[in-house]
Amino acid sequence: MHAIIPAGGVGSRLWPLSRRTEPKFLLDLSGGGRSMVRATVDRLAPVSDGAVIVTGAAHAAAVAAQVEGTGVEVVAEPSPRDSMEAIGLAAAILHERLGDVVVGSFAADHVITDEAAFHRAVRAAEAIARAGYVTTIGIAPTEPSSAFGYIEQGDALGAPLAGRVVVRFEEKPDAARAAEYLTTGRYLWNAGMFVMRSGVLLDALAELHPELHRGLLAIAGAWDTRGRADVLAAVWPTLERMVIDRAVAEPIAARGGVAVVPADMGWSDIGDFDALAALAPSPPALAVAAEGSWVHATRPVMVVGIPGAVVVETPDAILVTTREHAQEVKAVVDRLDGPLERLR
């Protein structure tokens, strides 16, 4: 399997730690001594034959510096698009070079604590992908979260394939519906991990989104030539923005062509400060007198009588919220304009 690592997005729910100039995949949020993108590369090394990171031009140099010496290729997008363009471009480049190979897409900014379980899931997904399925790895839910999309799993594929047919993908539900999903035992969290043959993906794009397919093939055909820059500049801005779930996974699932490997591997997307607080306790030197609070600061901070408080200090900004309202941080950051826009 050849790994594709999309490294994009600002991670605004983790503001002021994550910014446009230094998004969360460049940060060491888990306290492991490595950036999230480097940890992702290292995690994939035992189960991949190399990796391609797709990131924005503004962050390409920083990403390259963090993965120096790993042999990983960094592909720079000239302007922001979405997951389908990033994954499709890397898959098309690999297909142009190597033919019909298995590719797997794994986000640059997730944390997985049980890497052995992750490796088992990836190997199972690779075997299913070789049989022609678009394969995803679904996370066994630990709570009725409304922060994630869900995957409804159906019948088992049957030996030797260790997975199940995907019935459908569900958008983020409200809390009540998420609780209903958990009672059925049929639903998994959608972590956005996809494993498939490059030919299967490109054939799906040719059928479902022919203009995107033509554009990606044109760029891939010129990628290893002197004409790369010209073709990229001419074609990339014309590509319609799409997410891979809606572009490929959902319509292929409707015809029974998507499979899922259920996994319990200590996964977190660290999507907000509630998730970060669950993963990385506050530094012990800080005095916190409210249950479940989380503090990131250079000075001692005392929190009294505010359960689940979140206090984050950086040199130029301070955030005060609660874990309950952690998902709402992005909406406030999006309103920063005028002289405050530089803080985004």
Where are these regions (language model features)?
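Conserved core of the sugar-phosphate nucleotidyltransferase
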Residues: 115-236, 256, 322-323
